[in-house]
């Protein structure tokens, strides 16, 4: 069972001020997780968390993370712009993009961001549009499958991201000749792992690669970016990741591989968007309809516009009915109102018998929730609300209005 970070009474009060649906974030929880992460990697003097803006691109959230000592991982012009305007500067910004437009490389250089090259071919392109920086990172893709024990976690060979080992080594050689003085290695080999072993195993592979690359190229390796991949327990029966255990696991591998190779100075970076935010967000929605045909359908005022993951990935998000806990249960599909049959938050889920007007919370929407929203069926994206440490709630993004949807159109006047 998952317990929301707000009570029924708090939610009822919030819905008087903020109409459903809306995303709700927990400031205290965000800060607690950021501090736990920094404590877990305190053994590494240069450790830095670069929060992936794409997970939760809201300035109010990013300001909290800036206050907690985090940098940001960016992948587009607007994400770079947001980082700059919020006060992230220089090495506090990681720019990890692919198929990158020229203007984005130029802007990243203007801001002094650390560029993480996705492709060997990007060297010539980067050189043609802007100057080569003194510090640069390259993204590695080992190919094959990524395994933890007997479990296949992901298939890097099918991923469009990163370079082969041979390409990465050649990239380092050429970039060194072009004047790069400090290098980094980056890799993401699996997504949303719920295992304390993922980061240590990824670290082992990258640390062994680092030793080989330095031996063959003679470059100064300044940092290794473990990227993301540490997930959250979307399902209540899953054991959540323990970041302290994960950090100590990486520490052991660091001492085993990098220190003996004379690389004890290497800084460790992470990009933990999902781990940092997912569990600290809820999608608050109200039951508006109930329908019985071959199945029982619980209709809510949210839709895939507000949370795409179940429709896109078949992802599980736990649902709590805040009005009913001890009632008899029923098996239902929880659905939105889009003209698409995949607009379902839950399929054949056992929930307390639900009635129209009930408040539901959909858990773990703090990352890749609002940010993946869209406007199909001319649906409007919801508000975002921050539950502050002092218990007060603050609107940090208003709900869209019809005028917002129509603002970019020509030849249409909403006032007529």
For the regions a language model picked out, list residue spans one by one.
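Generic secondary-structure signature for well-ordered alpha-helical cores
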Residues: 20, 35, 39-43, 131-132, ...
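A charged N-terminal "starter" segment
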Residues: 1-115, 120-134, 177, 181, ...
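Active-site loop/helix belt of alpha/beta enzymes
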Residues: 142-288, 351
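Structured core elements
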Residues: 71, 94, 114-116, 137-139, ...
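Glycine-rich, aromatic-flanked loop segments that form ligand/cofactor-binding clefts
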Residues: 131-145
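Charged (often Lys/Glu-rich) extended helix/loop segments that serve as interaction or gating elements
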Residues: 258, 263-416
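Conserved, mostly hydrophobic/aromatic
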Residues: 30, 54, 76, 108, ...
